[in-house]
Amino acid sequence: MSSDHLRKIKFPCLIKPAQSHTYYEVFRKKMAVVNNLDELEVKFNECKKNNINVTVQEIIVGDICRGLNFNSLFFNGKIMQGFTAYKIRMTDDGYGIPIVVRGRRMIDELWEYSEKLLNKIGYEGYSCIEYKFDESDGLYKLLEVNGRYNRSSLLSVKSGINFPWIEYNYLIYNKDFAHKGYRKNIYYIDEFKDIQINIKKLLKGKQNLFPFLKPYFTTHVFAIFSIKDTKPFFKHILDGLIMMFSAKKSKFSNNNSTNRT
């Protein structure tokens, strides 16, 4: 990166990996916030040392709820089905993954932006494009394009748009489809992460009880629990217990080893 580029960077900003999983495997988080040029150099060199390609991304000012997902199926130069939701709660103080998301009405502006973008990059199929409304200039800013299904895709299914099933039938059986409406104001909840993060905030007085509970008492879909198939839910609990006891056992063994020394 040239010195001219460095001078144009506004701090704080984000160090963001080209491939999220490679960064997470090393640093156990999705990205890093840097506040000055020295921090940027340190974080960049850490990534370079671990052969992780990264980009520098501007931080868009605004609350978490200003972040939006635009899910769509794009074929033959146009969006054939769309779905919009906005973020309610996220991990890592708003820089991680969405753990509570709420479906909302379609935003025509995002439809137009997304169609132009997908045309330009020559992408076809399902995508989840993330935007954030910039309160400083009143414009939607592009964050990233995810060319894959993720767990929050369950929200669109619960709302009446089964993207995987529509795409499967289109690709395998050539079944055409047209955009249809969907139910709004349904919540997606990543129940384990939401409870883990926000119980701590509730105990410290950093989270109000009513806003925390509201999604659970409104129409919602969980990331893992389903009354139709409870095995993944109990498997997740079992895996968590195994990890917890393994960590305690490892800590106990290390303490004994230190004492013997």
Specify the residue positions occupied by each region the protein language model found.
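Glycine-rich phosphate/pyrophosphate-binding beta-alpha loops
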Residues: 88-92, 97-99, 146-161
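Conserved metal-phosphate-binding beta-hairpin within the catalytic cores
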Residues: 119-154
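Internal helical hairpin/lid segments
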Residues: 149-150, 165-172
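Short, conserved loop/turn and helix-capping segments at secondary-structure boundaries
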Residues: 104, 108, 157-162
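Phosphate-binding site of ATP-dependent enzymes
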Residues: 35-93, 105-115, 132-133, 139-141
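Peripheral (often C-terminal) accessory segments that flank ATP-dependent C-N-forming ligase machineries
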Residues: 169-261
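Active-site nucleotide/adenylate-binding loops and adjacent lid/helix of ATP-dependent enzymes
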Residues: 1-55, 76-78
